UniProtKB/Swiss-Prot annotation:
Entry annotated with the keyword Repeat: yes
Subunit structure: Homooligomer.
Region (2 X 4 AA tandem repeats of R-R-Q-E): 51-58
Biased composition (Basic residues): 13-25
Sequence repeats: 34-41, 42-49, 51-54, 55-58
Lineage top rank: taxon: Viruses
The enzyme's E.C. designation: 2.3.2.27
Sorted UniProt keywords: Activator, DNA-binding, Early protein, Host nucleus, Host-virus interaction, Metal-binding, Modulation of host ubiquitin pathway by viral E3 ligase, Modulation of host ubiquitin pathway by virus, Repeat, Transcription, Transcription regulation, Transferase, Ubl conjugation, Ubl conjugation pathway, Zinc, Zinc-finger
Modification after translation, per record: Auto-ubiquitinated.
Name listed for the protein in its UniProt record: E3 ubiquitin-protein ligase IE2
Biased composition (Polar residues): 1-10
Amino acid sequence: MSRQINAATPSSSRRHRLSLSRRRINFTTSPEAQPSSSSRSQPSSSSRSHRRQERRQEQRVSEENVQIIGNVNEPLTRTYHRQGVTYYVHGQVNISNDDPLLSQEDDVILINSENVDRERFPDITAQQYQDNIASETAAQRALQRGLDLEAQLMNEIAPRSPTYSPSYSPNYVIPQSPDLFASPQSPQPQQQQQQQSEPEEEVEVSCNICFTTFKDTKNVNSSFVTSIHCNHAVCFKCYVKIIMDNSVYKCFCSATSSDCRVYNKHGYVEFMPINVTRNQDSIKQHWRELLENNTVNNHTTDLNYVEQLQKELSELRAKTSQVEHKMTMLNSDYIMLKHKHAVAELDLQKANYDLQESTKKSEELQSTVNNLQEQLRKQVAESQAKFSEFERSNSDLVSKLQTVMSRR
């Protein structure tokens, strides 16, 4: 059944939403009604079975004590409990000041030994009765969450039309837990100031599947996703790989679902994969677009470029070391050749000196030979003169001898 609520001004509606978000149910026990630990007794098996039957009956009755405020086709924004009736508010509803549900006082249930129903619970204490009421309230909320999950699974199993799109489907309602009191509005200024005052801390977290380390800002963003049925996180890369291989994500805790949640500082987003297409060229096209349009101020690209330059620098340093080694060897050869050249110059100077000495000696010998030849020529001339003179003397003597002989 739906309930009509009188309209109010925007300022009053915001004030009333804040008052609703602060509503709670407090269970208090009077001091005289609290028994000591020694006086508590364990209930018998018959009382436990009786309580289970009563709990099932109250669970069936609790389904009738539910009132819905607003349009049921809109998402559930808040829920609260008052005087045995659970109220579910759907969508943005302005509640007037005259509504009795807007009492600023909390719903306090005082439980003592006098107001416990002894006919239904003859052997139960006030504390156990209070725990039973809290358990029944938690069971009702768990039942509502189960119904929401069943509705979501039925929507997934139901056949879809070719034009189905979850982003624009008017019948797709995101299930929310009745325990969530916060509306999908922007955070209040006090919350924003508190978030701004918190220091940002970068934390390195690793994936339990691929062991890749990511650096995220604590309580601000996250590179991990979780299933809608558990809180075990994996990186988005591993989630996509599992969905690509199996079409369904199964956690190591046996929770199976294809939907996942992505978190940031404002909340989380639930999404589910619609279509899985296996095409190896799509990632290449995607990377071409990334390299063309998304690498202008990319720190990773700069790091890759710096790494490439460092590699080139290392290669150039190695080549420079080789050139320096060759230069050292050439300098050594040059010094050795220089020493050889100096030795050759010394040898040449010595040879030149020896040549000069030999030339000088040769000139002296030539002079001596010339002198000897001159002396020999003079001696030959003298000898020829003497021989001529001897020949004349001999001729004269022969002629004289012939003359003497002829006279005889």
